[in-house]
Amino acid sequence: MLGSMARKKPRNTSRLPLALNPLKSKDVLAVLAERNEAIVPVGAWVEPASPGSSEIPAYTSAYLIEEELKEQLRKKQEALKHFQKQVKYRVNQQIRLRKKQQLQKSYERAQKEGSIAMQSSATHLTSKRTSVFPNNLNVAIGSSRLPPSLMPGDGIEDEENQNELFQQQAQALSETMKQARHRLASFKTVIKKKGSVFPDDGRKSFLTREEVLSRKPASTGINTGIRGELPIKVHQGLLAAVPYQNYMENQELDYEEPDYEESSSLVTDEKGKEDLFGRGQQDQQAIHSEDKNKPFSRVQKVKFKNPLFVLMEEEEQKQLHFEGLQDILPEAQDYFLEAQGDLLETQGDLTGIQSVKPDTQAVEMKVQVTEPEGQAIEPEGQPIKTETQGIMLKAQSIELEEGSIVLKTQDFLPTNQALLTKNQDVLLKDHCVLPKDQSILLKYQDQDFLPRDQHVLHKDQDILPKYQDQNFLPKDQNFLSRDQHVLPKDQDILPKYQDQNFLPKDQNFLSRDQHVLPKDQNILPKYQGQDFLPKDQDFLSRDQHVLPKDWNILPKCQDQDFLPRDQGVLPKDQNILPICQDQDFLPRDQGYLPKDQNILPICQDRDFLPRDLHVLSNDQNILPKCQDQDFLPKYQKVHFKEPYSDMTDEKGREDFSLADYQCLPPKSQDQDDIKNQQPASFMREERVREELPLDYHQYVVPKIQDQDSPREQNKHIKLPSSFEKWEIARGNTPGVPLAYDRYQSGLSTEFQAPLAFQSDVDKEEDKKERQKQYLRHRRLFMDIEREQVKEQQRQKEQKKKIEKIKKKREQECYAAEQRILRMNFHEDPYSGEKLSEILAQLQLQEIKGTREKQQREKEYLRYVEALRAQIQEKMQLYNITLPPLCCCGPDFWDAHPDTCANNCIFYKNHRAYTRALHSFINSCDVPGGNSTLRVAIHNFASAHRRTLKNL
């Protein structure tokens, strides 16, 4: 590298010829001479010189030329040797640099490993101010100066010696590292309660593990991350070693000195480690002065006096510990100042790292922000709180206010709703309310234990659950649980239902899981959502039948859960009013009503009857009112179903008239029940068709399997045609049942909206179908067009082949005719030869003409392409954009007879392309200033026309 720097050429060199430039080396001239082969004179003509002439003889000039050639060859060899020597020198220099880098890396790695090792003496601990190997300090660390290989001006011979020195140092470091590791591995712990004898014959007691952990101070180690960023030579000056972490943990367990706190101190003692924080200020100042006076590369050894570890108490030790930490801080600062001084000394010798400045100001001291860990650590012997004390139940966090308890349903209750009393407890859902002297067993779903003071309740206890999802309590009504028994007679229950409104005010009402109330009990439910039952109408449950008053009633609970399992038969004088929260009208499985019962349903929300309707008696007054809606409510299906035979016999079924099939109680089911009952409905439809006459089978609507919405229901409803409506209106339609005649007036107006909606749906479907059909036809015609184009191309090729064959045969026939004519008319023997010559000339002329024609075509094509390129450039120059001629490409120039698609009008149709070009050129308006562009466009069109004529 130094040689290359010395060989730099001056910048401002005058440009001279190679032979006259004195700065050009002879090596370069030799290389240039090598390129030009030497011309050796062979067979030179030599003439004797005239005796009076002063010219050099010929043999003398030949000798001079030979000597000059030899000199050139010698210079060439010297230049080659010099070049090889330089290459070898540079290669060796690169190899030496790589070896140095590897040695430096290994030395740095060994020094890092040595910084965490212990001293060679087993009784001494390694401090931060001491070297790892004090006995082999000069060998391990080496000279603070740089190796001679890095010094400027040194020779190559010293580099090999320096490499050997580096290898010896690395080997010594590895050996000492192995010794330190063996000593660390062979270090054994001291038995508990056994004192260790130090060189000063002083016994020191050992602490227990708890005391050591409680008194373990923060390490005063210096942030070593910045040391890792410094160069390798700076590390040679920094001799502080970080203690090995596991080794120091073992020291906590083994050396149980009261005042010995584990810290990476900056001084060592050969005779023993005494208390760092118990010594006096004078000793500390003496140590500081000694540390400042001693050179940094030496090992500092200090003996401590007057240890105070025997008389110190717990609080004094903590105080002295903090004072010791504060004293270490200036000592560490002095340490870094000395390290900085050594670094400045070594900077003068460094060549590769001349700009390195250690950033000692960024080193953070852990001592400033560290607190003793012993204050924050509790001894293991302290009793630990049990887990049950730490568990806080959600029920315990509820604060009872005097006079009232806020429930989640408070916003939905009436204003005069009575809240719980003071002595009542708030329980979770599905729990019971007990008196004061009874225990409570809460039901925790996610816990496996119960509170301490709670027990299991008995069945006969009163339960007051907290219902979060209901708000149907009346003003003066208390909560009833799901499985609560019958309330007394004088109790007034007025539930409030938000989702239903189809029971009158004076209707009796029974909750889901309650028994039947007696006759004199007044139950007044309040329904808000629906109003299609009369005031004096009783409400029937889903699975109950209507019987005369003197019958006993046992409800059938198949699909509901509002009656308990153990409910018995009620007496005659009781009214039955179950709660039907999930229904909008009368449930399924409903029996027919007796004759004396008057039912007047108000069917405002439907326009025809649902399925599963039972038969009513003939004398029953039925006046449906279908005014407001156009389609069925949700989950409603329409078909007729035969009545159950629970309360009627086959004889009664035969007496039912067809007119009774028209108006039956509606039914609402959940979607799951509808899916489960689909197979049974098909059987019912078949039975209904068998029982009805053939004329009425058209009015039995089949069940729709996938019935998701009322819109889909309306699609499958069989409606009468306009003619049938007209006949029904006139009353002349035979075979139409009376029920349909009764509802004809309502259906004529109510089905208009569904029919309009159905027509819109049909229009959309027809439109989609027409679009699909159009796409199919389009695909078909495109395929047909492609096939036609291919067929036309095949026909053209076939015609060309046929024409060639015809032309060849015609020529052969013409030649045969000419031969016959010559044989008949020309008897001259030389006439045949003349004719053959003439034919040969004609053939040559034809061949020549075809070649010329092909050449002209090529020239025309080249000319056209050149014109095309010229026009494109000029149009881009004048920012002229042209629209495309066809759909084969987005640009005007994409249209070409040779590149267009086979279904394009210009495909192999030069005549059409030329015609389109001419029409376009005549129609386009070229600016007046662009005369060259106008001329180029016209030339392009005329060239295409000539090409077309030649073709």
Swiss-Prot record:
InterPro entries: CCDC15. The keyword Ligase does not apply. The keyword Coiled coil applies. It is found in: Cytoplasm, Cytoskeleton, Microtubule organizing center, Centrosome; Cytoplasm, Cytoskeleton, Microtubule organizing center, Centrosome, Centriole; Cytoplasm, Cytoskeleton, Microtubule organizing center, Centrosome, Centriolar satellite. It comes from the Eukaryota. One of its GO terms (biological process) is positive regulation of centriole elongation. Keywords: Cilium biogenesis/degradation, Coiled coil, Cytoplasm, Cytoskeleton. Its main location: cytoplasm. GO terms for cellular component: centriolar satellite; centriole; centrosome; cytoplasm. Residues 64-89, 154-193, 782-813, 839-874 form a coiled coil. Plays an important role in primary cilium assembly, maintenance, and length regulation. Interacts with centriole inner scaffold proteins to promote proper centriole size and integrity and assembly of functional cilia. Required for the recruitment of both the inner scaffold protein POC1B and the distal SFI1/CETN2 complex to centrioles. Interacts with POC5, POC1B, CETN2 and FAM161A. This is Coiled-coil domain-containing protein 15. The gene is CCDC15.
